[in-house]
């Protein structure tokens, strides 16, 4: 939702302040295929295996999202 940095519906998430829906200090992310322990996964790490003719999708190192079609900057 607007203004939220993370999903405050899960108070057990150590990356997200459930009261404010903001990332905790030092956290880069709270969830996503390219987020691990509140930090972005390094650039080039496979986050989704190839299917058919499509290449593996890889983390960018700058986002918690896993981009489509293997583009990682």
Curated annotation (Swiss-Prot):
Compartments in which it is found: Secreted
Designated name of the protein: Disintegrin lachesin
Keywords of this entry: Cell adhesion impairing toxin, Disulfide bond, Hemostasis impairing toxin, Platelet aggregation inhibiting toxin, Secreted, Toxin
GO cellular component: extracellular region
Organism: Lachesis muta muta (Bushmaster)
Record-stated family: Belongs to the venom metalloproteinase (M12B) family. P-II subfamily. P-IIa sub-subfamily.
SUBUNIT field: Monomer (disintegrin).
Disulfide bonds: 6-21, 8-16, 15-38, 29-35, 34-59, 47-66
Residue ranges annotated as motif Cell attachment site: 51-53
Stretches assigned to the Disintegrin domain: 1-73
PANTHER family associated with the record: ADAM A DISINTEGRIN AND METALLOPROTEASE DOMAIN, ADAM METALLOPROTEASE
Task performed by this protein: Inhibits fibrinogen interaction with platelets. Acts by binding to alpha-IIb/beta-3 (ITGA2B/ITGB3) on the platelet surface and inhibits aggregation induced by ADP, thrombin, platelet-activating factor and collagen.
Annotated GO MF terms: toxin activity
Region (Disordered): 51-73
Pfam families: Disintegrin
PROSITE patterns noted in UniProt: DISINTEGRIN_1, DISINTEGRIN_2
Keyword Chloroplast applies: no
InterPro entries with a match to the protein in the record: Disintegrin_CS, Disintegrin_dom, Disintegrin_dom_sf
Miscellaneous notes: The disintegrin belongs to the medium disintegrin subfamily.
Tissue/organ expression: Expressed by the venom gland.
Main subcellular location of this protein, as a coarse class: secreted
């Amino acid at each position: 939702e607007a203004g939220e940095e993370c999903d405050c519906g899960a108070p057990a998430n150590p990356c997200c302040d459930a009261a404010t829906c903001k990332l905790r200090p030092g956290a880069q992310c709270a969830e996503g295929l390219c987020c691990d322990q509140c930090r972005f996964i390094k650039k080039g790490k496979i986050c989704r295996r190839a299917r058919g003719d499509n290449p593996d999708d890889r983390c960018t190192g700058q986002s918690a999202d896993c981009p489509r079609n293997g583009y990682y900057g």
